[in-house]
């Protein structure tokens, strides 16, 4: 019996020890649960911060890429249209050459002078063409207010709103209008 009592006491002590260990384990689990929830909350906050910063980074990267493209386009435009002002000034000289050629009478005395003027005129046109300046085709074309400047309108047997006479040639450099053509348009 003594042994049974002693075994019984050992079992009770073991039970009490298990109970106290169980309580300590439950308390530890509850504190760990609280720590785990805190960590999950911190993780969620850090994830939100990361997503916000990453989104800002992507926007900045897109803005920078667009900026680089815009600068490259502007540099290209500067190169393409660098001759625009001088070409515009030369158009008046071309007009004067055309007037000189048209008004000069064709005689033996004037023939060499006319050939010289025509040669210089052609060289000037070729140089401008080499640098992207082109004449705007207008004669017998439909009137386009972006390309033509109508100074007269006249009754005509053909279709209306067509260019029937070019009073002053128009020119463009690449896709930009230097000077619209002054035209007479049919009614």
From Swiss-Prot:
InterPro entries, per the entry: GrpE, GrpE_coiled_coil, GrpE_head
Region (Disordered): 1-40
Gene Ontology terms for molecular function: adenyl-nucleotide exchange factor activity; protein homodimerization activity; protein-folding chaperone binding; unfolded protein binding
Subcellular location: Cytoplasm
Residue ranges with Basic and acidic residues bias: 1-15
Cellular component terms per the entry's GO annotation: cytoplasm
Domain of life of the source: Bacteria
Parts of the chain that traverse the membrane: none
Biological process according to GO: protein folding
Gene3D superfamilies to which the protein is assigned, alphabetical: 3.90.20.20, Head domain of nucleotide exchange factor GrpE
Pfam family, one: GrpE
UniProt main location, coarse: cytoplasm
Keywords attached to this entry: Chaperone, Cytoplasm, Stress response
Sequence similarity: Belongs to the GrpE family.
Known partners and oligomeric status: Homodimer.
Function: Participates actively in the response to hyperosmotic and heat shock by preventing the aggregation of stress-denatured proteins, in association with DnaK and GrpE. It is the nucleotide exchange factor for DnaK and may function as a thermosensor. Unfolded proteins bind initially to DnaJ; upon interaction with the DnaJ-bound protein, DnaK hydrolyzes its bound ATP, resulting in the formation of a stable complex. GrpE releases ADP from DnaK; ATP binding to DnaK triggers the release of the substrate protein, thus completing the reaction cycle.
The protein, known as: Protein GrpE
Species whose genome carries this gene: Alkaliphilus oremlandii (strain OhILAs) (Clostridium oremlandii (strain OhILAs))
């Amino acid at each position: 019996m003594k042994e049974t009592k002693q075994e019984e006491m050992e079992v009770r002590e073991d039970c009490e020890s298990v109970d106290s260990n169980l309580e300590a384990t439950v308390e530890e689990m509850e504190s760990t649960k609280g720590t785990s929830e805190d960590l999950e909350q911190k993780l969620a906050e850090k994830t939100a911060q990361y997503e916000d910063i990453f989104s800002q980074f992507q926007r900045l990267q897109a803005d920078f890429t667009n900026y680089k493209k815009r600068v490259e386009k502007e540099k290209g435009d500067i190169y393409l249209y660098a001759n625009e002002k001088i070409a515009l000034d030369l158009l008046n000289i071309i007009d004067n050459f055309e007037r000189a050629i048209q008004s000069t009478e064709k005689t033996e005395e004037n023939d060499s002078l006319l050939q010289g003027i025509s040669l210089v005129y052609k060289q000037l046109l070729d140089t401008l063409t080499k640098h992207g300046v082109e004449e705007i085709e207008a004669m017998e074309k439909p009137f386009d207010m972006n390309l033509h400047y109508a100074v007269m309108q006249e009754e005509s047997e053909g279709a209306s709103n067509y260019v029937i006479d070019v009073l002053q040639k128009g020119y463009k450099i690449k896709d930009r209008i230097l000077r619209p053509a002054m035209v007479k348009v049919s009614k």
